[in-house]
Amino acid sequence: MVVKNFSDGTVVEIDRGRFDDWCIYIAGTCNRHAPKDVAYFTVVRGFGKRYGVDKVYADFISIYDKTSKSLDRSVLDHIETLSKDYGEYSNKFAIVFTIIYLGMVAEENKVGTRLGKRIKRLGIHQVLYDRYSPTAAANFSRGLPWTRIDNECKLRGF
């Protein structure tokens, strides 16, 4: 299912993946592929350096707070509105934060989840505030019990 077409020809889709029906794909201007956490964490870190971590995190939280188990077109519109603050990078912001939003919806729909969208928030927090590299943040939770990740989230206030 096409979620959004962007002005540069990029298309963001949701389709069946290996585990569920919530696999996110980028298509249009490139070979269709599922974006990796490290790729969008790298972009988020770059936005933090350019626009300030507090602004980028606040914009992320405004999306996070609106995220539920359902895809909501008003959240996509909200992302588009936020993107206007990012000047020449507005399209890149809209694409990356649409992907992050869909990732959070997917996490909320994951069978048996105890962490839901907080797992994405932890990664964003780690790259913006905790000085984790995008690779370290993307790999942080792999193999950890959910209780440890839950504690890491709680230590950061969420």
Predicted regions and their residues:
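Non-catalytic substrate-recognition and accessory regions of acyl/acetyltransferase enzymes
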Residues: 1-158
